[in-house]
Amino acid sequence: MLHLFLAPGFEEIEAIAPADILRRCQLDVKYVSCGPTLEVTSAHNTTVTCDLMFDEVDFAESEGLILPGGWPGAKNLLEHEGLRDVLVRHCREGRLTCAICAAPMVLGENGLLEGRRATCYPGFEEHLHGAELVPKLVVEDGNVITGRGPGAAMSFGYAIAARFAGWDFVRKLQEGMIFNP
């Protein structure tokens, strides 16, 4: 199971596009609320009803954690203590940890990008402590995948999907979705 975290102020395309792609690959993705209720409102006033509250999730079996950006969504993720503990443990155990746009700052501020290649939304580079900054849409380094911003949301989703379904399957999916990388 994959867990995609939503905090108030998240970026819609960075939350919806990757989940859609992963579900098209028959992967189980759950939206997890890092807010006070299951309903979380985005940076652009779209409300999404999550599957689970953060405190309801058993992360022991999680195969991947996904953080969308957006503002103040990424800041709200950074300030969520429970999420910080889960992310650090999960990433250090070598499990898939993904963040896009401003959200890689959550990884960087928690020491999870030290010695890794990563990307983020322009202006957030100072938060990627110890990372080698790579100005690409998507950067993969071991168990960490980072994405640059809203325009990279589909490429980010495909990169995550390929970890589970393989690139052959993902390329066929891209063709069906009229995506030309």
Predicted regions mapped to residue ranges:
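Active-site-adjacent pocket-lining segments in enzyme domains
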Residues: M1-L4, F10, R24-S33, L52-M53, ...
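Histidine-anchored nucleotide/phosphate-binding helix
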Residues: A19
